[in-house]
């Protein structure tokens, strides 16, 4: 049985993952610039290799965040649908959840959307 509390949790989860994804994207940009700068300045090969590893790890997190976001979004949609079936169609939590779903789908279009 879906509850408003579960809906709030799933909404917050989606928001947190979106924030995390943006953070990783910024980190990749920052680390890529740092790596390019190190290459231009002729940095020590060991340091350059370590920096490339850092950049690679940051890049690996983006697809992981996308998968988690798709899963969290699916959970949120199903919880929202369950609540609407039980005639709870209004309220600040439901509006927030609908807004979050719309925002996530607009920013990150999925294959099924």
From Swiss-Prot:
Effect in UniProt of substituting residue 16 to A: No effect on beta-tubulin binding
GO cellular component: cytosol; peroxisome
Keywords: Chaperone
Variant or mutagenesis effect after changing residue 24 to F: Slight decrease of beta-tubulin binding
Outcome following mutation: residue 57 to A: Loss of beta-tubulin binding
Renumbered residue ranges of the record's region Disordered: 83-113
Effect of residue 30 to A: Decreased beta-tubulin binding
A Pfam family of this chain: TBCA
Effect of residue 50 to A: Decreased beta-tubulin binding
Reported effect, residue 26 to A: No effect on beta-tubulin binding
Superkingdom field: Eukaryota
Disruption of the gene: reported phenotype: Embryo lethality. Embryos consisting of variably enlarged cells with cell-wall stubs. Abnormal microtubule organization. Endosperm indistinguishable from wild-type endosperm in regard to nuclear multiplication and subsequent cellularization. Cells undergoing cytokinesis divide abnormally although they display pheragmoplast microtubules and accumulate KNOLLE in the forming cell plate.
Gene Ontology molecular function terms on file: beta-tubulin binding
Effect of residue 64 to A: Decreased beta-tubulin binding
Residue stretches of biased makeup (Basic and acidic residues): 89-113
Effect on the protein upon substituting residue 29 to A: Decreased beta-tubulin binding
Tissue expression from the record: Expressed in leaves, roots, flowers and stems.
Biological role: Tubulin-folding protein involved in the control of the alpha-/beta-tubulin monomer balance. Functions as a reservoir of bound and non-toxic beta-tubulin. Required in the developing embryo.
Family: Belongs to the TBCA family.
Record's subunit section: Monomer. Supercomplex made of cofactors A to E. Cofactors A and D function by capturing and stabilizing tubulin in a quasi-native conformation. Cofactor E binds to the cofactor D-tubulin complex; interaction with cofactor C then causes the release of tubulin polypeptides that are committed to the native state. Interacts with TUBB9.
PANTHER family: TUBULIN-SPECIFIC CHAPERONE A (PTHR21500:SF0)
Name of the protein in its database record: Tubulin-folding cofactor A
Organism of derivation: Arabidopsis thaliana (Mouse-ear cress)
